[in-house]
Amino acid sequence: MKLDYINEENKFNEDEFEELTEDEIYLNKGADAYQAGDYETAIRLYQKSADMENITALSNLGYCYYYGRSFPVDKTKAKECWEKAAIFGDIPSVYKLGDMYRYGDLPQNLDYSHALYKRAFLLALDNMDNYYVAPDAFLRMLKYYPEEISDFGYSPIDIAAHCVIGIKDRIARGDNYSGKVLSDAKAVLIKLLDE
């Protein structure tokens, strides 16, 4: 999937921005700054985009708060961002809330975490071509509830292979944060193939 606003060097084409809305321009420039490690600029641009009701920018702000990008870690603010974005079906926000309930960032609730992972998985099935979000949602179900994947008409092995391919694709496009996720996806695929 070639994004029309990214050129061969994985930099945003200024000429292509006229096809995007103002909030999308701020979002994409923020993502470019984030990948370059310029978190202050990324946060400023994400906030502008979120103020224009861009749900992805709101989700990305959640990551900045959760991981302490340019300010102290604030998991309460991360949760607030992700809850707002999850209402609109933002896949990363849904599974990150699931992580917070699974790993104890919020009062641990494995049943609710499971429900959130399942919701993210179902949303991702409708967005399988989006390698920036679908593999992460799939991976959580593969790690914790692989037996349920076939209930939706998919083979866990096929979903795991899709994850590996998708994560490799986004790394090739300049994603600097997916190395560990790729290792996890490969490990899950190998485990499934060995069963």
Residue spans of the language-model regions?
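TPR-adjacent "capping" and linker segments in tetratricopeptide-repeat scaffold/adaptor proteins
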Residues: 10-25
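Short helix-capping/linker turns of helical repeat alpha-solenoids
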Residues: 21-22, 52-54, 67-69, 87-90, ...
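Alpha-helical segment of the N-proximal tetratricopeptide repeat
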Residues: 22-41, 45-48
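Hydrophobic face of amphipathic alpha-helices that form TPR/SEL1-like repeat modules
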Residues: 26-33, 60-67, 96-103, 138-145, ...
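TPR/TPR-like (Sel1-like) alpha-helical repeat modules
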Residues: 111-126, 139, 152-172
